[in-house]
């Protein structure tokens, strides 16, 4: 059934439901969000989508806002979270290679994580339920326990090029990272 007033969904029996999950692995805009709908209507007669080989004004404006809000200097737009994970894996490994031509390719990921359904994303997903049907996965991935800095440190070697994690794990519940854990991993 149609959604009404951004608050939730209705079924064929006219019962209303509030969605406290906000979708699975997506950003939450609500349902039938009028501001979002109007922005889409305004844009549809202009440019809907271009390859990331080309820039467009909305993309540049969004990049500028992201840079200003985060203090970071680069933005990489993708079509999905899975594609973002694939890009992150490739950037980490390419950076390590270009830095000194080394084989520093190991990535540390967290147990009980979920990063997507592509082969690369499954490789850094810390859940064998998702991984097993698609093995062998890409190599060089190690797993540590979320919110356990010593577990992460135990996995770091001279071949480590990246650590990948969700700041809030949503697999099997809602588990936010402790600030001290994030600060320790960042060091």
Regions found by a protein language model. Name each.
Residues 15-16, 174:
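Residue-level signal for well-ordered, solvent-exposed loop/turn and beta-edge residues enriched
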Residues 16-102, 106:
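Glycine-rich loop-to-alpha-helix module at the N-terminal edge of alpha/beta enzyme cores
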Residues 65-162:
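PLP-dependent aspartate aminotransferase-fold enzymes
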């Amino acid at each position: 059934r149609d959604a009404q007033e951004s608050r939730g969904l209705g079924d064929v029996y006219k019962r209303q439901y509030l969605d406290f999950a906000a979708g699975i692995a997506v950003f939450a805009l609500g349902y039938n969000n009028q501001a979002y709908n109007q922005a889409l209507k305004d844009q549809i007669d202009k440019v809907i989508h271009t390859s990331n080989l080309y820039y467009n004004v909305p993309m540049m404006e969004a990049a500028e806002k992201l840079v200003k809000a985060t203090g970071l200097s680069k933005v990489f737009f993708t079509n999905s979270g899975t594609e973002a994970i694939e890009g992150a894996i490739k950037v980490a490994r390419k950076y390590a290679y270009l830095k000194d031509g080394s084989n520093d390719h190991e990535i540390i990921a967290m147990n009980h994580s979920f990063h997507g359904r592509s082969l690369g994303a499954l490789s850094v997903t810390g859940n064998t339920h998702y991984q097993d049907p698609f093995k062998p996965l890409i190599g060089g991935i190690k797993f540590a326990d979320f919110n356990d800095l010593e577990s992460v440190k135990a996995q770091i070697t001279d071949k480590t090029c990246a650590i990948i994690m969700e700041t809030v794990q949503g697999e099997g519940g809602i588990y936010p990272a402790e600030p001290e854990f994030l600060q320790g991993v960042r060091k």
